[in-house]
Amino acid sequence: MTKTTTTDFDTLRDGDTIDGPTFAVSRESIRLFCDASLDYNPLHLDDDYMKGDFGRTNFGGIIMHGMNNFGLITRMLTDWAYPAGAIQRRLETRWLKPVKPGDTIEPIGVVKSKQSTQKSRWVLIDVLVRNQNGEQVATGEAMVEFPVPGSIAA
């Protein structure tokens, strides 16, 4: 795999990687996401609740919102694609492992394939999020649309 900073559709190759920003997860960052999303589920806020009857999930304490992973992936794709006039059109993710306060996570994209049509150019990207131990905590697939040279969007 080759790390890419290019957003030139023609020079992108299958296997090129896109690195995203690292994110240090804290109780405060989890609380701020609760406030932003209006999701005050005790999964994200209440250690006692997580250790009680619900504790059979074995999380052992509060966990970060899965949508926070989604947002980090979206930020990575937007930071990479937007300068070229490209737009994230689709993102599907699956949460694999809970993320807890004290974890540091980082999204990564891997170019899977490219396709050109008369009206647009498409890049399919495998995405994943890893924690500080190299464990995958989320995985998925994204589609980014690049404008055709000479089009109004280009």
Residue ranges and their predicted role:
Residues 2-87, 149-154:
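Hot-dog-fold acyl-thioester-processing enzymes
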Residues 21, 29, 87-91, 105, ...:
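A generic structural signal for short beta-strands and their flanking turns/coil linkers
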Residues 22, 95, 109-111:
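Conserved hydrophobic positions within beta-strands
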